[in-house]
Amino acid sequence: MKVRPSVKKMCEHCKIVKRNGRVMVICSANPKHKQRQGK
């Protein structure tokens, strides 16, 4: 899980979701693409 100030889709399988008020990227194809916005 990467924590970044700005999250972007890294491939076509990435999805942007909002959980508990946080913006997150989840990826079914490559788990390395998981990201969360905020510090």
Swiss-Prot record:
One of its GO terms (biological process) is translation. Coiled coil: none annotated. GO terms for cellular component: cytoplasm; ribonucleoprotein complex; ribosome. Belongs to the bacterial ribosomal protein bL36 family. The keyword Ribosomal protein applies. The lineage of its organism: Bacteria, Bacillati, Bacillota, Bacilli, Lactobacillales. The keyword Membrane does not apply. GO terms for molecular function: structural constituent of ribosome. This is Large ribosomal subunit protein bL36.
